[in-house]
């Protein structure tokens, strides 16, 4: 689990997301509180429940990007889901319980990777011995059994040295590796994913663990053998228990587009993909026990972060019980022209940096001037104001249109320097931006 302070988390988010300081502070505090809770004594720790967050803001201002970056920083089981994909229990579609099952699967995968990494040094030693056994087979007694030698032979030590120095990397050997499990694809209706995964596991285990001889270069064989030996050193039962503990104590669920499951206006009959989903989310957020293929998972201390644009619906349109379980409200601000300028230049992998790198592969050197950046930002903001406001996503549309000609002719422009300034941007975009009908369809 991440031990970063709130200030460090915000600083890391600042490298990728412009503005939205309130949202960054809220998620940073929530993440740090996970660590603080684990420092408490057992009795008090059980009483401290997470303060779930509701992020409200127009589309394209950074709600989903905060979730993506948070997943990398958290070093904890994390899953992002779309609220619109679920239906009420009893109807065709995914049930909300599958959120916890998917989160547990992600945790098992994460814990397995950590366990394999922890055992990598020992696995490398075992893989090395298996390759040496192929290169220099150990001596056998009269009954065909391998004799245990007190000291490795001089030849074995010489080959070990060559192996470690990479002198034997390109030599081909034939080695026995675990055969891939039998692949069985089972198609089932939505909502029955749990049953299909159990059937697949059953079929895969039918054949047992078989060995298959393969001819490989030593450097390729070494990678496969390390993975195989590391997997043998991992205890599956311990791994499952560690994964369940990680989900229960540190798990984070990000629910996007929650405004799309708000009930709109007066309607009769069951609303299975809106209010029904909200009712099903209640026990998860409040705390319940969900059955997964790895074991029972309690959701009492899982942190839920919900987000939505709320352009048509309002947060008060959520059912009152769910509103009460999302106590921290954070409003994200609409982006201005100066925000667009910063988005184009400040993030570590801004879209201007990406375009420059892509064109550099063809030998074309692109240079964006300050005046060019300013004009691109103004054009994006202008189109957002005159048509539909889609936030920072408009920059991708505008820049793609601006770079279209260069991207098409890049292979013929090798070795050239192209400067994108205000005049260049105006020449290529002004006519489109000014014509509202054209910008509505093209930008």
From Swiss-Prot:
As for subcellular location, the record says:
Cytoplasm
Q: How does it assemble?
A: A double ring-shaped homohexamer of HslV is capped on each side by a ring-shaped HslU homohexamer. The assembly of the HslU/HslV complex is dependent on binding of ATP.
**Phenotype for residue 63 to T:** Can neither bind nor hydrolyze ATP. Do not form multimers, but stays as monomer
Any one GO MF term held by the record is: magnesium ion binding
The name under which this protein is listed is ATP-dependent protease ATPase subunit HslU
Q: Which GO terms describe its biological process?
A: cellular response to heat; protein denaturation; protein unfolding; proteolysis; proteolysis involved in protein catabolic process; response to heat
| Keyword Chaperone attached | yes
What does the annotation give as the result of altering residue 321 to Q?
Complete loss of activity
**What is the purpose of this protein?**
ATPase subunit of a proteasome-like degradation complex; this subunit has chaperone activity. The binding of ATP and its subsequent hydrolysis by HslU are essential for unfolding of protein substrates subsequently hydrolyzed by HslV. HslU recognizes the N-terminal part of its protein substrates and unfolds these before they are guided to HslV for hydrolysis.
Regarding temperature, what does the record state about activity?
Optimum temperature is 55 degrees Celsius.
Name one matching Pfam family: AAA_2
Please tell me one Gene Ontology term that the record gives under cellular component.
membrane
Q: Which positions bind ATP? A: 18, 60-65, 256, 321, 393
Give a yes or no for keyword DNA repair in this entry.
no
Name the reported effect of residue 95 to W.
Partial loss of protease activity
Which family, according to UniProt? Answer: Belongs to the ClpX chaperone family. HslU subfamily.
Induction annotation: By heat shock.
Q: What's the reported outcome of changing residue 286 to Q? A: Reduced protease activity
Q: Impact of changing residue 288 to V on the protein?
A: No ATP hydrolysis activity. Binds ATP with lower affinity than wild-type. Can support HslV-mediated proteolysis to some extent
Q: Which UniProt keywords apply?
A: ATP-binding, Chaperone, Cytoplasm, Nucleotide-binding, Stress response
Q: Which organism is it from?
A: Escherichia coli (strain K12)
| TM segment ranges | none
InterPro entries per the record? AAA+_ATPase, ATP-dep_Clp_protease_ClpX, ATPase_AAA_core, Clp_ATPase_C, HslU, P-loop_NTPase
């Amino acid at each position: 689990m991440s031990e970063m302070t709130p200030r460090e988390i915000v600083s890391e988010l600042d490298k990728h997301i412009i503005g939205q300081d309130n949202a960054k502070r809220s998620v940073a505090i929530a993440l740090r509180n996970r660590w603080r809770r684990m420092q408490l004594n057992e009795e008090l720790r059980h009483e401290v429940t997470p303060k779930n967050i509701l992020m409200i803001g127009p589309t394209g201002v950074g709600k989903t990007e905060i979730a993506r970056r948070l997943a990398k920083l958290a070093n904890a089981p994390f899953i992002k889901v779309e609220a619109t994909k679920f239906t009420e229990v009893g109807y065709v579609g995914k049930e909300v319980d599958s959120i916890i099952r998917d989160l547990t699967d992600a945790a098992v995968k994460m814990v397995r990777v950590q366990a394999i990494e922890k055992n990598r040094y020992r696995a490398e030693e075992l893989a090395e011995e298996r390759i040496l056994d192929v290169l220099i087979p150990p001596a056998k007694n009269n009954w065909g059994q391998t004799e245990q030698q007190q000291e490795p032979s001089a030849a074995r030590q010489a080959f070990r040295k060559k192996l470690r120095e990479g002198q034997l990397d390109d030599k081909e050997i034939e080695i026995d590796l675990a055969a891939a499990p039998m692949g069985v694809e089972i198609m089932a209706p939505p909502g029955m994913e749990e049953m299909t995964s159990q059937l697949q596991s059953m079929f895969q285990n039918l054949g047992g663990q078989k060995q298959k001889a393969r001819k490989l270069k030593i450097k390729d064989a070494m990678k496969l053998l390390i993975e195989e030996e590391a997997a043998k050193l991992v205890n599956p039962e311990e791994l499952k228990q560690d994964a369940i503990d990680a989900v229960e104590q540190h798990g984070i669920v990000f629910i996007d587009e929650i405004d799309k499951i708000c009930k709109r206006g007066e309607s009769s009959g069951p609303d299975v993909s809106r209010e029904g989903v909200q009712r099903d989310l209640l026990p998860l957020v409040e705390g319940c026990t969900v059955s997964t293929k790895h074991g029972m998972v309690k959701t009492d201390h899982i942190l839920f972060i919900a987000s939505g644009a709320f352009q048509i619906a309002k947060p008060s349109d959520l059912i009152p019980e769910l509103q009460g379980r999302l106590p921290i409200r954070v409003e994200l601000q609409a982006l201005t022209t100066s925000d667009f300028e910063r988005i184009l230049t400040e993030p570590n992998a801004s879209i201007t940096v990406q375009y420059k790198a892509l064109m550099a592969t063809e030998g074309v050197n692109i240079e964006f001037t300050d005046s060019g950046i300013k004009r691109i930002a103004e054009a994006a903001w202008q189109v957002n104001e005159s048509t539909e406001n889609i936030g920072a996503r408009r920059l991708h549309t505008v820049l793609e249109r601006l770079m279209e000609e260069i991207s098409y002719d890049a292979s013929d422009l090798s070795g050239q320097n192209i400067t994108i300034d205000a005049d260049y941007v105006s020449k290529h975009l002004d006519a489109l931006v000014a014509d509202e009908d054209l910008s509505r369809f093209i930008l």
